[in-house]
Amino acid sequence: MSAPAPAHRRIARTLAAATLLAASALVVAQAPPAVAATSQFKGVNWADTRDNYNSGWVIPDGLAASDSYSQVYSIADSYTKAFVNNLGANTLRLPINPPSVSQSWWGAYKGAIDAALHNNMKVIIGAWTESSSVGTITDMTAWQNMWSTVVSAYGGNGNVYFEPLNEPYGYSSSQWISIASSWLSAFSSVPRGRVIIAGTGYDDHVGDEGASSALSGTLLSLHMYGTWASSTTESAWVSNLNSRLGGYASRTVITEFGGPMTTGINYLTNHNNGQYQSFVAAVTDTARSDGFGTVYWAGLKTGDNYSMEAHNGSGLSNTNSSGVTQIRWGWGY
């Protein structure tokens, strides 16, 4: 989810460091070509209950900082099976940040990625800024080192996708495109079809990124929420969504969208007379008709009424059957 829009800071320092990143010679395993079209992404976000913007480790709901690799793997295995069986999901989006990868948590946290892969899920590894930042990369060297570690570990796995930065809202589109293209140069052995580039701002428009030749061949990440307008008709939300896609639906994955799931809303009604119902209907109907993938926020995040799943013993259960039906409709079921 998005943090409140902050003032821009550290842009000049970050852009200067991006130049160094582009010149870096990072050696990673040659990965196979990507084969997935965006309609194949039927996903959920597994989020930290504190939110993924964090100055320390990001720890998805249900995991603990003291967990070992085997403990993380076991929990993630149970949860990913629930995402598959309860929802029909085949994609899991997981957060990282520099402390999570540079410190001891990474050794355990890899268990979540590995368990999802073992269950034949695609995994989107997305980088969040730290909580003290303002939509810009806090420390470019740490960000570069984080991605070097992650790509070295998973660059050779065709089911892992890399999202260099979530919601780069502290940059203009041209600044962000420069940084993203630097990432592509630094990690050139990763097929571009397995790199998901955030849209401008809060991932809220992808037109500039889609039009950039520097980012050609990449996938694009779009976020959209029903709180971003007060529309109550599906047609109004469809128009809003299409303006954000900018003609690049074929390359776009909506990596965040959602609505309240624990408040009793029936998502199978009021598609033309309800703010959240019409919003979710617009996204899912358009995804189905236009053939692009979606990753729901959140699949699991206790305390967030958007959460599609809730803890139930050692497993998970659905929080809103109508919401599940509507999300699955968008996935082509």
Model-derived features: where do they sit?
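Aromatic-lined substrate-binding rim segments of carbohydrate-active enzymes
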Residues: 76-131, 142-143, 184-192, 272-290
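Feature marks short, surface-exposed loop/turn motifs that line or immediately flank catalytic pockets
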Residues: 48-52, 98-100, 131, 168, ...
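Extracellular glycoside hydrolase catalytic/binding regions
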Residues: 58-73, 141-161, 165-293, 297-301, ...
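N-terminal carbohydrate-binding accessory modules
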Residues: 14, 22, 31-91
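Bacterial N-terminal signal peptides that target proteins for export
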Residues: 3-17
